[in-house]
């Protein structure tokens, strides 16, 4: 049981970091677009 857990954790962390990175880029794009439109 202790085998699959550590193996699965890095993949989950990688996916979460990727998701947060995309979210951050999206938020930055929205902020920049609103700034330029203003």
From Swiss-Prot:
It holds the Pfam family PsbL. One of its GO terms (cellular component) is photosystem II reaction center. The chain crosses the membrane at residues 17-37. It is found in: Plastid, Chloroplast thylakoid membrane. InterPro entries: PSII_PsbL (IPR003372), PSII_PsbL_sf (IPR037266). One of the components of the core complex of photosystem II (PSII). PSII is a light-driven water:plastoquinone oxidoreductase that uses light energy to abstract electrons from H(2)O, generating O(2) and a proton gradient subsequently used for ATP formation. It consists of a core antenna complex that captures photons, and an electron transfer chain that converts photonic excitation into a charge separation. This subunit is found at the monomer-monomer interface and is required for correct PSII assembly and/or dimerization. HAMAP family: PSII_PsbL (MF_01317). This is Photosystem II reaction center protein L. The gene is psbL.
């Amino acid at each position: 049981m202790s085998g699959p857990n550590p193996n699965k954790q890095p993949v989950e962390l990688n996916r979460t970091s990727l998701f947060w990175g995309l979210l951050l880029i999206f938020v930055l794009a929205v902020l920049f677009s609103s700034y330029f439109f203003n």
